[in-house]
Every structure is written in C-alpha cells, then in structure tokens.
Regions:
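Bacterial Sec-dependent N-terminal signal peptides
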Residues: 1-6, 10-43
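First exposed extracellular module after export/assembly in secreted or surface-exposed proteins
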Residues: 31-248
C-alpha cells in the first residue's frame, strides 16, 4: 500500500465526503470518499471495512489486490482508505457500501501503550531520541483503539528515511478514578544532528483493552495526552470503547 500523508477526515465517507465524477443521471455517477477503518476478513475470501464514524464498506477483491500489490492487508488492522462507489451500491439505510473500488490509502501504525518503567527500560524516554511534535492534530477512541494523528518532522540518514515511532506512555502514579494521563513520545531513532524532513502526518492506533483493568471506577474515562513541548488534549471515552466487540 502506498505510504502517503493527507488531511483529516471530517465526516462519514458514504454521504458527506463525496465528489461526483460523472455527468449522466445520478444512478450512473461515481463518487469518491475516504475514511478511517478497522479491517476484518482475509485475502482468500473477502474484506469488510468498518468506519470509525459508523457504517461499513465492502471493497472489491480486485481493488484490494491492486492497492496491496496482490498481498492483501496482511496483519494490518487499521488504515485510512480512499475508494470510489456509485449510489446504487449504498444500502437503503445508508450504512453499507458494497463493491467499492479502493484506489489509495495508508496503514495506521499499531502499538500497545506502555508503562513509564517499560519506556525507560527501552530508552523511549531518552532525551536524545525524543523530537518535538509540531501539532497533535486529532485524538479519538473507537472500538478498542485510541487513535492519534501528529504532525512532525522525520529523519533521514544517508538519504534513507528513518521511520519514527509514536508511543503512549503512562505513569501508574498519574492514574486516578476514571482518569489516566499518557505522555506521547515521538522517537525518530536518530540523533539530533540527523537530516530533518517534513513535517508530515503520522497516524497511530493504540490498543486500549487493558485500561479497564488499571483505571479504577465504573464511569467514562477522561484520557489526557501530553507532548514533550506542552501540547495537551483531553477526551472522555466510554469504557465500552476500550474493547473491539463483535463487528458482525
């Protein structure tokens, strides 16, 4: 799949983010859309893509093959995907698009949040590995994932781009009833003198199923995410959204 950077989605793909590509009657028009999806299924049968804003998209397997160089989505569970469709492919309840043609996209990196002790041991919190995030563009939680979009430069060494990691780190001392704070570390895996490119957007999904066990209380949980240069965002998340649940 192509590795690219793009603007953020603002509405469910099926209705609000469309553009007409045809001039015939509406039933023959082709529309384009994109969104954030959880991927289910496999390359041997079929895939269903579940939108973070509700609804689902069932792509053609030929378009999946073309987009992924005939490899399928593999072990990837999260992606931002672009596709085209016709109105006749939308279900009457406007919740499902069948036979969509994927034509571009990028995977989310997927990580487990870790404790400060684990981060210290892995040198994630080492000062020379941490670079400033220009902007914490978006934070949201949905069905087992806490998702972040950050804008930051990245490094290159000898003309080769070095892929950074985006880690969420919690200190057990910061946990209180129905509340937890994460420090977000942007690690470029190079020293401060490495060539800098960008900035660009980085998309990450962090698994949340463990939060029920470590955050006391029974109510919605306030999650605070802080960067090393003072940017902070708070979101309130239903405990139900800490778990993926059944998609079918």
């Amino acid at each position: 799949m192509k590795y690219f950077y793009s603007i953020l989605i603002s509405a469910f793909v099926a209705i609000a983010l469309t553009s007409c590509l045809g001039d015939s009657d509406e039933s023959e028009n082709t529309y384009t859309a994109y969104g954030y999806y959880t991927i289910t299924g496999n390359f041997n049968s079929s895939y269903t893509l579940y939108s973070d804003l509700g609804g689902k998209v069932i792509p053609t397997m030929s378009s999946v093959a073309n987009l992924t160089d005939n490899k399928g989505f593999g072990n990837h569970s999260r992606a931002m995907l672009y596709f085209s469709y016709k109105p006749s492919q939308v279900s009457q309840d406007e919740k499902t698009i069948t036979g969509a043609e994927l034509f571009d996209g990028r995977y989310f990196d997927e990580y487990l949040p870790i404790s400060k002790q684990q981060a210290d041991d892995a040198l994630i919190t080492a000062t020379d590995s941490i670079f400033q995030i220009r902007e914490l563009n978006d934070v949201w939680a949905y069905r087992g994932y806490l998702n972040t979009v950050v804008n930051a430069p990245y490094s290159s060494v000898n003309g080769v781009n070095v892929k950074p990691t985006v880690n969420l780190v919690y200190d057990p001392a910061s946990i209180s009833e129905n509340a937890i704070t994460f420090d977000i570390y942007f690690n470029r895996h190079t020293d401060q003198n490495a060539a800098s490119n960008g900035p660009v957007y980085f998309y990450t999904s962090h698994l949340l199923n463990f939060i029920d066990e470590i955050v006391p209380g029974n109510g919605d949980v306030t999650i605070t995410i802080k960067t090393s240069n003072g940017i902070s965002k708070d979101i309130k998340v239903s405990r139900q959204n800490f778990h993926k649940g059944n998609y079918e």
